[in-house]
């Protein structure tokens, strides 16, 4: 997989230019999205382009999240206090990590968008709430670009579809990353849809980290 498009707000650019912990977070996320390969015996990511909507997207997300959890110690399903305690509505952040060096703390929340455009707007708004209320210091959304999304599950949103609304994040440290396959080939196997063909694994949930302190 490869990163093909990015939108980085000025606030995020400033943090990236001077903050080592934010740089580390950004590099870990980019490494994770570039890590998936397909087929499994390959060294690159090639997607089957036989017809529209012929591949699944969840296995791609899980390959990315496996690296974030197992190698970089990110956690899944981090609730925002503003949603859980005050508004009592809304789901947790997909993946979250606290970067600590000496007495400095940076909290990063990320969403890997596999839903439709409405889902993407919810993800963006959720992360904006986290930034506004001081619960995270950097927000990141990963999503396929339009070319790749055409061959993924029906109605999966894409970078270009959400792009007209990126300006809503200006004034906040926010990064959007659009990824693409390295090659297209009708002869490679289809990526299973949903969780089909995926081995079950135990995910690292934030609540388990908190409860085990």
Curated annotation (Swiss-Prot):
Mg(2+) 2 binds at residues 77, 94. It comes from the Bacteria. Its cofactor is Mg(2+). One of its GO terms (molecular function) is type II site-specific deoxyribonuclease activity. Binds 2 magnesium ions per subunit. It is an enzyme of class 3 (hydrolase). The keyword Hydrolase applies. The keyword Chaperone does not apply. InterPro entries: BamHI/BglII/BstY (IPR011338), Restrct_endonuc-II-like (IPR011335), Restrct_endonuc_II_BamHI (IPR004194). The active site is at residue 113. Keywords: Endonuclease, Hydrolase, Magnesium, Metal-binding, Nuclease, Restriction system. It catalyses: Endonucleolytic cleavage of DNA to give specific double-stranded fragments with terminal 5'-phosphates. Its EC number is 3.1.21.4. Mg(2+) 1 binds at residues 94, 111-112. GO terms for biological process: DNA restriction-modification system. The protein sequnce was determined following expression in E.coli. Homodimer. This is Type II restriction enzyme BamHI.
């Amino acid at each position: 997989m490869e990163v093909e498009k990015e939108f980085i707000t000025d606030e995020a650019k400033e943090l990236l230019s001077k903050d080592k912990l934010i740089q580390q977070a950004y590099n870990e996320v980019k490494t994770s999205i570039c890590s998936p390969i397909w087929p499994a015996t390959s060294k690159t990511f090639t997607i089957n382009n036989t017809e529209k909507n012929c591949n699944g997207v969840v296995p791609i997300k899980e390959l990315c999240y496996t690296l974030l959890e197992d190698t970089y110690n990110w956690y899944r399903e981090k609730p925002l206090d503003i949603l859980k305690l005050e508004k009592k509505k809304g789901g947790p952040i997909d993946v979250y990590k606290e970067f600590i060096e000496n007495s400095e703390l940076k909290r990063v929340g990320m969403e890997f968008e596999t839903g439709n455009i409405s889902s993407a707007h919810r993800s963006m708004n959720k992360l904006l709430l986290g930034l506004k209320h001081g619960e995270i210091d950097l927000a990141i959304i990963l999503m396929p670009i339009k070319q790749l999304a055409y061959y993924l599950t029906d109605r999966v949103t894409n970078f270009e579809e959400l792009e007209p609304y990126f300006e809503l994040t200006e004034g906040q440290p926010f990064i959007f990353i659009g990824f693409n396959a390295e090659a297209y080939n009708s002869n490679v196997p289809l990526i299973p849809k949903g969780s089909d063909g995926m081995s079950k694994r135990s995910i690292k949930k934030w609540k388990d980290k908190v409860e085990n302190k």
